[in-house]
């Protein structure tokens, strides 16, 4: 690998910062400590700093020269509601809160790149987006709705995530869908309760809800093109509390994922049609509440071509995978992808414990690798 020597020299200093963030994890939109630390460091490095963008988001801006070119680099800051089970000397000090997805590493790598870039000559504007609440709370959307790109516009935006694939390659990137969309649905099947001995005097919600559970599983197998990818997963089905009482309501909670917008739209249409048909056939009411967790993380071809050249320079072409099979997991960087030309990459964490696990450990070697990637992207574009 051909990492930036000055960044490698700063590795030890920023490992301590990463461990400090790891010890003090914060859930989405509660990243007060982390945001304050980020803002403090950026000010020390000479950036203009803007806080409370999307509640707890932070933006650092550094402009040099007279070019109108603008590049955005993004990192997420939030932790997960997990009790850490590692034996790390810097393990979480908070009960049931842990950096189990490596966002402490993402944040620190961007800070490391920020320090290095502040000492370099470039021509244009560097925007650093430190995003809150990636874990299902829509932090990217909150920043956008708070005027992120009106105030701090970028021609391209780049991000990355550590990924413990356990493979030989160090860097993964592809054109098109990198990660799936994620939509959550909460469905209420509303009947009329009654005594278990007299179902004819009630409107049992459990039977139509059971039909609904089965019918929803047919969406992918019977409607989605087999060459496309979609997942419908029912995670909760609840009704009643007693053996002799027909309840008023049954509830279903599920997630729906897709790798393209057409399939995503198709699954949504089928959900509503199935619910409508079952409601009519059983003379009950069905209410649907949909929440958009994340759009498809759709990489832009131009951005991928540019980032691929940077990755090959840094990691060597043999260590890069550009024909990567997309993940069905989601990432709210997808909201950025809907607005700007973006490229989202994975860096191998070299650890066999997967994300969102209480024993997960971020590999500190990635700090210099990711910071070098961030820095090369900026310097190559703003040359």
Where are these regions (language model features)?
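Histidine/acidic-residue-rich, glycine-tolerant segments that coordinate divalent metal ions
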Residues: 59, 80-82, 87-98, 105-108, ...
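Divalent metal-coordination and catalytic microenvironments
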Residues: 21, 60, 73, 103, ...
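Non-cysteine beta-strand/loop elements that form the S-adenosyl-L-methionine
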Residues: 72-74, 83, 185-187, 344-349
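Acidic/His- and Gly-rich active-site-bordering loop/insert found
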Residues: 1-99, 104, 108-123
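Metal-dependent amide/peptide-bond hydrolase catalytic core
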Residues: 210-383
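General structural feature for long, well-ordered alpha-helical segments within catalytic domains
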Residues: 10-13, 17, 30-41, 69, ...
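A structural signal for isolated positions on well-ordered beta-strands in alpha/beta enzyme cores
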Residues: 50, 127-129, 287
């Amino acid at each position: 690998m051909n990492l930036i020597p000055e960044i490698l020299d700063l590795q030890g200093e920023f490992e301590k910062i990463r461990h400090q963030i790891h010890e003090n994890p914060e859930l989405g939109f509660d990243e007060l400590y982390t945001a304050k630390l980020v803002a403090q460091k950026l000010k020390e490095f000479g950036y203009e700093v803007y806080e409370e963008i999307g509640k707890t988001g932070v933006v650092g801006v550094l402009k040099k020269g007279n070019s109108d070119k603008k590049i955005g680099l993004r990192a997420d800051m939030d932790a997960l509601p997990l009790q850490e089970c590692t034996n790390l000397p810097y393990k979480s000090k908070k009960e049931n809160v842990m950096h189990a997805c490596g966002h402490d590493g993402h944040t620190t790598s961007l800070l490391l790149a920020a320090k290095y870039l502040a000492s370099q000559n470039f021509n244009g504007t560097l925007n650093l987006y430190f995003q809150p609440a990636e874990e299902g709370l829509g932090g990217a959307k909150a920043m956008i709705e708070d005027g992120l790109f009106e105030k701090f516009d970028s021609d391209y935006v780049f991000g990355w995530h550590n990924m413990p694939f356990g493979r030989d390659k160090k860097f993964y990137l592809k054109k098109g869908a990198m990660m799936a969309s994620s939509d959550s649905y909460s469905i209420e099947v509303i009947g009329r309760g009654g005594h278990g001995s007299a179902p004819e005097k009630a409107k049992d919600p459990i039977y139509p809800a059971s039909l609904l559970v089965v019918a929803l599983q047919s969406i992918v197998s019977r409607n989605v093109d087999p060459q496309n990818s979609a997942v419908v997963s029912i995670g909760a089905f609840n009704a009643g509390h007693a053996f002799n009482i027909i309840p008023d309501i049954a509830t279903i909670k599920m997630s729906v994922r897709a790798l393209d917008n057409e399939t995503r739209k198709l699954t949504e249409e089928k959900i509503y049609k199935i619910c409508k048909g079952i409601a009519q056939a059983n003379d009950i009411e069905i209410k649907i509440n949909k929440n958009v967790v994340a759009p498809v993380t759709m990489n832009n071809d131009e951005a991928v071509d540019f980032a691929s050249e940077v990755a090959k320079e840094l990691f060597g072409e043999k260590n890069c995978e550009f024909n990567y099979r997309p993940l069905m997991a989601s990432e709210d960087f997808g909201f950025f992808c809907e607005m700007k030309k973006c490229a989202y990459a994975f860096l191998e964490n070299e650890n066999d414990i997967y994300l969102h696990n209480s024993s997960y450990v971020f590999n500190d070697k990635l700090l210099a690798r990711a910071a070098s990637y961030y820095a090369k992207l900026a310097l190559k574009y703003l040359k």
